[in-house]
Amino acid sequence: MKKIEAIVRPAKLEALKDAFLEAGIKGMTISQVQGCGNQHGWKEYYRGSEVIVNMLPKIMLTVVVEDDKVDSTVELICNTARTGEVGDGKIFVFPVDEVVRIRTGERGDEAI
């Protein structure tokens, strides 16, 4: 099993949720995050002082999938979230040693 974390533009959230559901990925965690990278921020003025805003709002989607679904899930995220502009985001893939469904005690793939 792998945990996939995708940090994407907030405007892509609904399209990604729809794509996940269509692909049979039912469980996901969505967090509002801020980040910086190659995408530069902007300047604002507050009470006459210049303020550089370089932490930009993003959405982090987290899903856990079976090993054989990792490539297709990453491809789905890329195809859905890509605009071709700086700031499209990043995808991180981590190994998952164990998953336990608290309600039933199920473990492994059955708990996803």
Q: PLM features: residue spans?
A:
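Positively charged, small/polar-rich N-terminal and surface patches that mediate targeting and assembly
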Residues: 1-112
